[in-house]
Amino acid sequence: MESTLGSDLARLVRVWRALIDHRLKPLELTQTHWVTLHNINRLPPEQSQIQLAKAIGIEQPSLVRTLDQLEEKGLITRHTCANDRRAKRIKLTEQSSPIIEQVDGVICSTRKEILGGISPDEIELLSGLIDKLERNIIQLQSK
């Protein structure tokens, strides 16, 4: 019998993301916005778009649309790097701080609800298995 593990994991990611999007809708943000803001917030100040894209694990053109949306909402600013006029530096605005706090609260409470009824040992086991799968895939990609 063929394993459906890959499909099962993909479906889990889809429904998890859909729930996050639903919960963030009152803030007029999406899971993609949160991931971007979260990474900008945790990285050293004024990262370039290239550095941010690498940290998130996406291509730079995919990131630009999200950054445009966050800039329109007044949550980030972008300015040209003094050393490299082609590069843009990203900075959170003062307005973003309370929003990031709200979003983090939504994400944290949603995560707790999703993981409800699952023991810490089970979560640790699952995380370990996911790490193993990721390492196997990375190793296969490098061949």
From Swiss-Prot:
GO terms (BP aspect): response to stress
Molecular function in Gene Ontology: DNA binding; DNA-binding transcription factor activity
SUPFAM superfamilies recorded: Winged helix' DNA-binding domain (SSF46785)
Protein origin, superkingdom: Bacteria
DNA-binding region(s), residue ranges: 49-72
Chain ranges of the HTH marR-type domain: 2-135
HAMAP family recorded: HTH_type_SlyA (MF_01819)
Family: Belongs to the SlyA family.
Subunit details: Homodimer.
Name of the featured protein: Transcriptional regulator SlyA
Underlying gene: slyA
